[in-house]
Amino acid sequence: MKKIVSILVALSLAVVAWAQNPMERSMEAFPVAKETHILCQEACALLQNNPALAPQMVVEALQGGNRQYANAVLTYADETAGAKALVKAVKKVYPSLSDASKADVLYWIGRNKLTALQKIVDEGVASQEVSEASMAAVFAAVQMGGKHNMALLDGCIKAGSPLAQEIQRLRGQVNEDDDDSTRNELRDQK
């Protein structure tokens, strides 16, 4: 009986540890290279122990070229320090990023509805070239919603922007977790 109890206790402790470690959960869902996995675990541990490192770590990760690592750092920095703590650092580093890193930042802006970084979204949507970053800017504008973004997207469609087709596609696929006001605005703008 004692052996069964000790096994159950060990199992419950393992489940609790797994539930408290978001890094482990995400690594199971998305297979990555072993060295990237180790880097992500280290970053997660550093951020959990010292959230003040988040802005610096995000900048370094975004400039580093390892996209999986950069997204993991951005996610865990967001969870530990909060998105608003990262705004200033992201705004400063954004112009020097690769197109792929800019896209990752724009998806993050859209998911977090960071109006403090609206200018970055505006510039991406106004781009006259179709790139990963400009498509992510459209996504961010749709996710953020609001009259400004809806007018921006509508203006792109009317002007015949190369992004018009992507804008219309995304307007038709608004996420179910968006609030009703965003869904209504998108529906009314069609």
Which stretches of residues belong to each language-model region?
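Sec-dependent signal peptide recognition
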Residues: 2-10
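Sec/Tat signal peptide C-region and signal peptidase I cleavage site
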Residues: 15-19
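Terminal, low-structured helical/coil segments at or just beyond the last alpha-helical repeat
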Residues: 158-190
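Alpha-helical repeat scaffolds
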Residues: 58, 87-93, 119-125, 151-157, ...
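Structural detector for internal amphipathic alpha-helices that build alpha-solenoid repeat scaffolds
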Residues: 28-49, 59-63, 68-82, 91-95, ...
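Cleaved targeting-peptide boundary
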Residues: 20-27
